Amino acid sequence: MPPLRSRTTTAGRNAAGARALWRATGLTDSDFGKPIVAIANSYTQFVPGHVHLKDVGEIVAEAVRAAGGVPREFHTIAVDDGIAMGHGGMLYSLPSREIIADSVEYMVNAHTADALVCISNCDKITPGMLNAAMRLNIPTVFVSGGPMEAGKAVVVGGVAQAPTDLITAISASANSSVTDEGLSEVERSACPTCGSCSGMFTANSMNCLTEALGLALPGNGSTLATHAARRALFEKAGRVVVDIANRWYREDDASVLPRNVANAKAFRNAMALDVAMGGSTNTVLHTLAAAQEGEIDFDLETIDEISRKVPCLSKVSPNSDYHMEDVHRAGGIPAILGELRRAGLLHTDVTTVHTPTLEEWLDTWDIRSGKASAEAIELFHAAPGGVRTTEPFSTDNRWSSLDTDAAGGCIRDKEHAYTVEGGLVVLRGNIAPDGAILKTAGIDEDLFSFQGPAVVVESQEEAVSVILGKKIKPGDVLVVRYEGPAGGPGMQEMLHPTAFLKGAGLGKQCALITDGRFSGGTSGLSIGHISPEAASGGVIGLVENGDQIRIDVATRTLEVLVDDAVLAERRAKMEASERPWQPVDRDRTVTTALRAYAALATSADKGAVRRVP
């Protein structure tokens, strides 16, 4: 049996100094020899998805103590992508993923913790902690803060708006027909409670994926932050982590370790879920990164393969008026996985931290299986409270009925899928030989084939300027380059450009392609993650204004219609220039911290992880 890692600092004469310090934190003789459980919290007053997490660490800690473990809590940073959006703050978002992963690794290894509970929620925090868990490979349970309630419907300028969210507010700000009073009405309704933004954006997508990976408990991705039912998830996480720690250290059961739970089959399941639910394109970036951290065989080719055979079964905001509370009412992640299981598109022989196999989990938690437990039925009745609040567990409202409509409800079956192929696709071509990502769940099928002239800009700020300056016309392809992991640096999200296109009435008439990335709130013909990026010598850096760009989803291609000989001439000219593969006229402050990230960052097809010599 493997010894407790913490014995290094709790057992033997040589550990006297460390034990003295442990005692100063409150430990006693009876604690030495028990598994020390690190609780990685991410509470901050900057982020609505984390503002309510201040006390939940103690809920987990109490459960750990009761189960026979020794809890020790610490905190990571957390960047709010929405607040950082549209200015220099967004340069720090993706690099913060690496800082979070490093900080968790540092704390856990420096203090020889035996197990880990990750209390995450928003965009880069769950991926950062996931990367750390895959690196550390010690017993780990994820429990997130939960989704925000959707904003309530409002009337703006005589037009009824569907339940609102962050994207509604951003799009309205670019719509000149919306008055200041109307915009204020939308803004005040859009984000009514604590929790991760209410649509199938990056945060909620990743929290759903941790369920599919087997590292989080049932309901983790969809139970609202405000609902009393979520408290039980934190309590159970504390019990489960001690159980799996004991199975590893006392029974030599390696099946509970993250790399054996979230193995190659589990990553395939997670991506099948992502494709089926039309998740954020950022999930591609983050799953690729996590797989690399865990040395799991999972790459962009695997994602492409999955996207070709898994149908799109659910469309949630920003792609419909459904929000996470509606996904929950329809049975949450187990219901989507259940439909994939019935379609033969799931590996059910993988394990989870809470149930021996995925097969057994879905038998008792899929509300459409006919065998769902009373616990599952009870959980998925949890409904929004409809009250503005930053308090977790503050409502106990219940839906009067569940949404089990597989033909036209929030979650459909394969026979009634939105599209035969999934909501995310990998495109390739001369402009993206190493791949690019498109969220097809966010566009109409009549846009699956598109061609138009390039309008080239070399920063997100310039993109916003040309859109708001009415320089983009129907049929144009806006090319935003030098916004990749190294070129940005930091691979900014292009939420403002896409939201402003939508607000200007161009969301279905133009395309936007970039070596940057998109918010989970992005919709429209928005292609990101173009690899190689411009700063790494990618062809996107050679595109000129007026070049014809062709997009064809059916053939999975993205091309600039310029002869190879012409591209070769442009490349030679670029290489001979004074500042090759750099933006010509961009005013941007790049700090030492960002330059350090840029020096090591890989392109998006590698997950934008750091390449360390």
Swiss-Prot record:
Quaternary organization: Homodimer.
Gene Ontology biological process: isoleucine biosynthetic process; L-valine biosynthetic process
Pathway as given in its UniProt record: Amino-acid biosynthesis; L-isoleucine biosynthesis; L-isoleucine from 2-oxobutanoate: step 3/4; Amino-acid biosynthesis; L-valine biosynthesis; L-valine from pyruvate: step 3/4
Annotated positions binding [2Fe-2S] cluster: 122, 197
Family indicated by similarity: Belongs to the IlvD/Edd family.
Catalytic activity field: (2R)-2,3-dihydroxy-3-methylbutanoate = 3-methyl-2-oxobutanoate + H2O; (2R,3R)-2,3-dihydroxy-3-methylpentanoate = (S)-3-methyl-2-oxopentanoate + H2O
Organism ancestry: Bacteria, Bacillati, Actinomycetota, Actinomycetes, Mycobacteriales
Cofactor(s) demanded: [2Fe-2S] cluster; Mg(2+)
Protein's name according to its UniProt entry: Dihydroxy-acid dehydratase 3
Protein's job: Functions in the biosynthesis of branched-chain amino acids. Catalyzes the dehydration of (2R,3R)-2,3-dihydroxy-3-methylpentanoate (2,3-dihydroxy-3-methylvalerate) into 2-oxo-3-methylpentanoate (2-oxo-3-methylvalerate) and of (2R)-2,3-dihydroxy-3-methylbutanoate (2,3-dihydroxyisovalerate) into 2-oxo-3-methylbutanoate (2-oxoisovalerate), the penultimate precursor to L-isoleucine and L-valine, respectively.
N6-carboxylysine modified-residue sites: 124
